[in-house]
Amino acid sequence: MARLVGVDLPREKRLEIALTYIFGVGRTRALETLAATGISPDKRARDLTDEELVQLRDHIETNYKVEGDLRREVAADIRRKVEIGCYAGIRHRRGLPVRGQRTRTNARSRKGPKRTVAGKKKPGRK
């Protein structure tokens, strides 16, 4: 199994897709990397030579922030926003959507499951 920047690439997938398993590398970056190294996007990960793996590793490590470094940077950015108390930081602290989505309905994935609030009982009919 081909291993690149700490991630096992799926052997059966085309390189264009397999590279997206690396955090911080999407389809566009994968294609840019393959074009810069001169490797065909249609090639399967199992068919990579050691030389091509080294080329890919060097290109990704020198040109992009990926995996642990990127995760740390994102976490630090969020922590900084929370500390300075800006609007986005407050939304992070409260566990609400940060980018302007509505919260009157929906937003359940960010807010968690519904917490039912006890209310007044309706009087029964006779």
Swiss-Prot record:
Family to which this protein belongs: Belongs to the universal ribosomal protein uS13 family.
Q: Which HAMAP family match?
A: Ribosomal_uS13
Q: What is this protein called?
A: Small ribosomal subunit protein uS13
Provide the species name: Salinispora tropica (strain ATCC BAA-916 / DSM 44818 / JCM 13857 / NBRC 105044 / CNB-440)
InterPro entries recorded: Rbsml_uS13_C, Ribosomal_uS13, Ribosomal_uS13-like_H2TH, Ribosomal_uS13_bac-type, Ribosomal_uS13_CS
Any one GO MF annotation of this record: structural constituent of ribosome
Share what the entry says about its subunit structure, partners included.
Part of the 30S ribosomal subunit. Forms a loose heterodimer with protein S19. Forms two bridges to the 50S subunit in the 70S ribosome.
* Task performed by this protein: Located at the top of the head of the 30S subunit, it contacts several helices of the 16S rRNA. In the 70S ribosome it contacts the 23S rRNA (bridge B1a) and protein L5 of the 50S subunit (bridge B1b), connecting the 2 subunits; these bridges are implicated in subunit movement. Contacts the tRNAs in the A and P-sites.
Region annotation (Disordered) maps to 95-126
